[in-house]
Amino acid sequence: MANLTGNVYIDGLWLPGHGAPFESVQPVTGETVWDGNAASLEDVDAAVREARKAFLAWRRKSLAERQAVIEAFGELLEANKEELAHQIGLETGKPLWESRTEVAAMMGKIPISVKAYNERTGHTESDVAGGHAVLRHRPHGVVAVFGPYNFPGHLPNGHIVPALLAGNTVVFKPSELTPGVAELTVRLWEKAGLPDGVINLVQGGSDTGKCLARHSLIDGLFFTGSSTVGHLLHEQFGGQPEKILALEMGGNNPLIVQNVSDLDGAVHHALQSAFLSAGQRCTCARRLLVPKGKKGDEFLARLVEVAARITVAEFDADPQPFMGSVISAEAANQLLKAQAAMLEKGATSLLEMKQLKPDTGLLSPGIVDATGIELEDQEFFGPLLTVYRYKGFDEALELANNTRYGLSAGILSDDRKLYNRLVEEVRAGIVNWNRPLTGASSAAPFGGVGASGNHRPSAYYAADYCAWPMASLEAGKSELPDSLAPGLNFD
């Protein structure tokens, strides 16, 4: 594959952006790993207009033709998986072992998307009185895809693949923190034979994103990212019911512990839930609900003991660490400030989160006991876990639902009845039992309620927001019915 150029990609051409210069920086070494210019207003306009021009020809291709190009992209992912995994680790700081799983998820998304398209948005016919009922699905047109930095390959891919399969054209605006991953990915789409204009790449920060979101010629926007930005987009799209908006945002996710016989098994799942990807998964456990008393004390003691031994290092360290860095030194500093603010309000540190190397994104895991403390209902996107102690399961459920978010929730318990109550009473789109909260299947819907989304779940249900249904009643010719409505006379 070609070296990174720092260009935007519009109508099959790699061109310099005309906006402000910017760069992405390796979060530990400070090395510049990508530099270029943001897409200007004119660049964004050109990208949208070229996507509009390419739409009719792309949607008119058969499903098999579109699928063939997408599967060619999957083959190129396989052939270039190490290079892409390295770029993901380089820009995000996540360890290579985890970056490789991200590329594997990108490849796995393709057959799942094909299956979902056929099952949820395919073509069906049935006989009805006087003819046939036919259900078809049609693409929206030009859709904007906004990608996040935590999974810069997999998460935008989860929008792009089903959107293209359905016949849409795409303008992709990745996170300004991971532009290199986006450029490599779009180069693979180009190499796969995707026609010019079907996918376009506009790099840049909030100015570029605002230009794209407000463009009059987009038919929809698919977003994965922070609740703050998602709510701004929702406000901006108010009064535009003709445009589809799919928002997948974060959560202040609760994980309940109660009646566990395998202490280390439960501790393992709690650590995976809180600290996988350095806590930078939207489904990560942010609040750990532990019973008061001896059993809860034993669980917390073991949790802190094992968490203190978690290895943290650079993405390409050998041996590989469990955790890499967070996305930037700035993000690390914000997390440290959040920890300090909790302690100032009276919370107790069980395991102090520390910056392991000055001016880097390397943070050790942090665990804070905030029982009885009023804290802001906020998602802290990093390795910072807040513990709340409870007396009975009713209180645990009340604490679990004490959030405006509703993305994920779970319980670690041998008692199936407690899980049944959680499923019945919790408000969350993903609810797990004796599994980490960070485990989610692409063969199931992925999304939340409340401030975590707008009822447009992604993953297997992404097919739903990538196409709209057209229902038809059909007959071969017009015939006079056997019986007429009252008041009609053809004699």
Curated annotation (Swiss-Prot):
InterPro entries on file: Ald_DH/histidinol_DH, Ald_DH_C, Ald_DH_CS_CYS, Ald_DH_CS_GLU, Ald_DH_N, Aldehyde_DH_dom, SuccinylGlu_semiald_DH_AstD
Reactions mediated catalytically: N-succinyl-L-glutamate 5-semialdehyde + NAD(+) + H2O = N-succinyl-L-glutamate + NADH + 2 H(+)
Pfam families: Aldedh
Single Gene Ontology MF annotation: succinylglutamate-semialdehyde dehydrogenase activity
Keyword field: Arginine metabolism, NAD, Oxidoreductase
Pathways involved: Amino-acid degradation; L-arginine degradation via AST pathway; L-glutamate and succinate from L-arginine: step 4/5
GO biological process terms, semicolon-separated: arginine catabolic process to glutamate; arginine catabolic process to succinate
Keyword Oxidoreductase: yes
Enzyme Commission (EC) number: 1.2.1.71
Binding positions (NAD(+)): 225-230
Active-site positions on this chain: 248, 282
Family to which the UniProt record says this protein belongs: Belongs to the aldehyde dehydrogenase family. AstD subfamily.
Role this protein plays: Catalyzes the NAD-dependent reduction of succinylglutamate semialdehyde into succinylglutamate.
Name of the protein in its database record: N-succinylglutamate 5-semialdehyde dehydrogenase
